[in-house]
Regions:
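General N-terminal targeting signals
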Residues: 20-22, 26, 33, 64, ...
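Short glycine-enriched loop/turn motifs at secondary-structure junctions
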Residues: 7-8, 49-50, 69
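Arg/Lys-rich, positively charged N-terminal/basic patches that mediate binding to nucleic acids
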Residues: 1-29
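A short, surface-exposed loop/turn module that caps and links secondary-structure elements
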Residues: 30-58
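Preference for short coil/turn "hinge" residues that link or interrupt alpha-helices
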Residues: 9, 38-43, 77-80
């Protein structure tokens, strides 16, 4: 499946320490393998439907990754739970 990263995701991602960036990469990789049918649904991702096509996964204890699942996966935002809620209210 095709994917893209929005500017809102990139801006937040670049501000994360490298250790947290690595966890984000690992979570995205695990998600992509699941969506492509390479693995069963992973339990550690905390895959959660926000609304319609908007989904969230965990990247460690603090960070969440918000994405839209439609014809392609669009990664929208990375941040903590409260920041994701604020981002969704602004859309």
């Amino acid at each position: 499946m095709h994917y893209e990263f929005k500017t809102s995701f990139d801006r937040r991602f670049k501000k994360l320490p490298s250790s947290r960036q690595e966890k984000v990469y690992q979570s995205i990789d695990t998600l992509m393998k699941y969506i492509d049918g390479e693995t069963e649904q992973p339990t550690g991702l905390g895959l959660k439907n926000w609304h319609a096509d908007y989904w969230e996964i965990r990247a460690g204890i603090r960070d969440r990754i918000l994405f839209e699942l439609a014809d392609k996966i669009t990664f929208l935002f990375v941040g903590n739970h409260d920041e994701i809620k604020k981002f969704m209210r602004s859309r």
